[in-house]
């Protein structure tokens, strides 16, 4: 009798183990089975928000997955990322954010996180940054601008969205190559305001994603782009690499991150979904209409990009803080 009971118990245990083994893959396969919250550290209606909503529309139509896009703008992106860092690491709360928010902001001010506080899921997009001038200014190239700024040190200035951003510190790195030229940095609230100021003659140079120049392509001349290669929309605009230094490369990179310790199978599933969405011809057509360039990388590669960003801007940020502390 006891042998019979033992055999039955052994059989039951084996069946239970088999069911557990089957349940684990099934759980992974069903993720996500409820809406995903995507926290945006930017305002509604701008390029990252548009990108998120285009991706969300694809996921809903193709897979029935709801992407709840929540804007939590302000505070240099800190409140949004702090909220994300405290979320449950189950893959149901993620963020579409920028390398600037993840790597530059934490080095400038205490904020309770670094880029290593998050799980990199996927790089999604790159925005080519450019320097635009008015043709009426007579500025024909970067070298020409620097020569003019040397001769008239109080005449020229460069505007860009945000006071303590990657653009600000890229500008600092660039100006080291032109110590006799004076082109001070002026912060604006956003790309729209900046372009309006340029068109009105209130600023000499605008530094912003070239997508902001495209609606005014005949009115604005792009004299340099900070990507590694020339931009498809402005093929005649040389890069800073061509004109100054091979290390002066900076694209405005956006990607998906989540809290630390999201299970690997869920990270992989999210990567698959976003990769598929960005490869869809319909999604690509919609992104092209709003001048957004898809640029997919898996999480591990996106993490390397974030480290490169952090390392590139560490020196100018340190220089800025030392100078500020000495004042």
Model regions and ranges:
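N-terminal secretory signal peptides that target proteins for export/translocation
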Residues: 1-7
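Bacterial N-terminal signal peptides
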Residues: 12-22
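Sec/Tat signal peptide C-region and signal peptidase I cleavage site
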Residues: 22-28
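N-terminal (or domain-start) structured segment
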Residues: 28-117, 155, 177-207, 212-216, ...
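An extracytoplasmic/periplasmic, membrane-proximal ligand-sensing/linker region
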Residues: 33-35, 265-327
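Hinge/capping helix and adjacent helix->loop/strand transition within the periplasmic-binding protein
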Residues: 83-92, 106-193, 240-242, 249, ...
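Solvent-exposed coil/turn segments that connect beta secondary-structure elements
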Residues: 99-100, 126, 136, 211, ...
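Anionic-ligand binding region
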Residues: 194-244
């Amino acid at each position: 009798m006891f042998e019979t009971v033992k055999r039955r118990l052994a059989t039951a245990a084996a069946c239970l183990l088999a069911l557990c083994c089957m349940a684990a893959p099934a759980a992974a396969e069903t993720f996500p089975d409820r809406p995903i919250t995507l926290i945006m550290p930017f305002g509604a209606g701008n390029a990252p928000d548009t990108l998120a909503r285009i991706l969300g529309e694809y996921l809903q139509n193709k897979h029935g997955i709801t992407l709840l896009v929540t804007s939590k703008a302000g505070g240099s992106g800190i409140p949004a990322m702090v909220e994300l860092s405290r979320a449950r690491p189950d893959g149901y709360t993620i963020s579409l954010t920028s390398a600037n928010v993840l790597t530059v902001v934490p080095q400038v001010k205490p904020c309770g996180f670094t880029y290593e506080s998050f799980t990199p899921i996927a790089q999604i997009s790159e925005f080519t940054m450019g320097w635009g001038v008015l043709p009426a200014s007579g500025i024909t190239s970067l070298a020409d601008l620097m020569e003019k700024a040397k001769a008239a040190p109080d005449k020229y200035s460069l505007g860009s969205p945000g006071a303590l951003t990657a653009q600000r510190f890229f500008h600092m790195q660039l100006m080291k190559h032109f110590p006799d030229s004076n082109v001070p940095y002026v912060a604006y609230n956003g790309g729209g305001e900046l372009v309006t100021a340029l068109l009105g003659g209130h600023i000499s140079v605008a530094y912003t994603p070239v997508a902001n120049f495209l609606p005014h392509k005949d009115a604005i001349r792009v004299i340099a782009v900070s990507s590694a290669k020339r931009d498809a929309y402005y093929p005649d605009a040389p890069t800073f690499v061509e004109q100054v230094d091979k290390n002066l490369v900076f694209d405005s990179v956006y990607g998906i991150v989540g809290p630390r310790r999201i299970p690997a199978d869920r990270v992989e599933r999210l990567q698959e979904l976003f990769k598929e969405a960005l490869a869809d011809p319909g999604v690509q057509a919609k992104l092209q209409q709003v001048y957004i360039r898809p640029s997919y990388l898996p999480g591990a590669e996106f993490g390397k990009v974030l480290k490169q960003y952090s390392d590139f801007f560490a020196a100018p940020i340190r220089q800025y803080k030392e100078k500020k502390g000495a004042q």
